[in-house]
Amino acid sequence: IETLGHRGDEPERLDRPIDPWDLQSIIYTSGTTGPSKGVLSSYLHLFTMATSSREMLDHTDRRLINLPLFHAGGTGNAYCMLVKGGSIALVDSFRTETFWDIVRDSGSTCVTLLGAMTPFLMKAPPSPQDRDHPLRNAFMVPLPADAAAFRERFGVQ
């Protein structure tokens, strides 16, 4: 069986070492204010995203990623867990009705909630299972005014 991308010879040599500001990839904005836009992301930008939550997470964490991997939210979260040595649970989208079941089934301990995700979860009817999950950390962007109510209801930092 041939390994994907393996040609049996040495990898091509670089003309120069990679610098932190060199282009690593193109990621896309969410399109909140219009069509999605491509953003040139350097190695330093992605490294900074990957290490921004280093104090809160470790190798035992599993991050639920419900954001596309072409978006900074998906890419940065995946890189974060690579840096930490943790794992990811990758799902195709956010759905209020299945969010907590996915958290429980996947064993996810952290998640990033963007925009309307937090209000949608708060508007769901209270349940005896609101605190029956492994989630410890929720990174909310933007931080909603009722973040304390979210923490109290769901037992999440």
Predicted regions and their residues:
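Short aromatic/basic micro-patch
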Residues: 17, 40, 112
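Conserved AMP-binding/adenylation subdomain of ANL enzymes
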Residues: 47-62, 70-110, 120, 124, ...
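Conserved adenylation A10 loop of the ANL superfamily
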Residues: 26-38
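ANL superfamily adenylate-forming
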Residues: 1-20, 125
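Short beta-strand->loop structural element characteristic of the AMP-binding/adenylate-forming
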Residues: 2, 37-40, 65-66, 87-93
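Conserved structural elements of the adenylate-forming
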Residues: 7, 11, 20, 24, ...
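Adenylate-forming
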Residues: 1, 67, 92-99, 108-150, ...
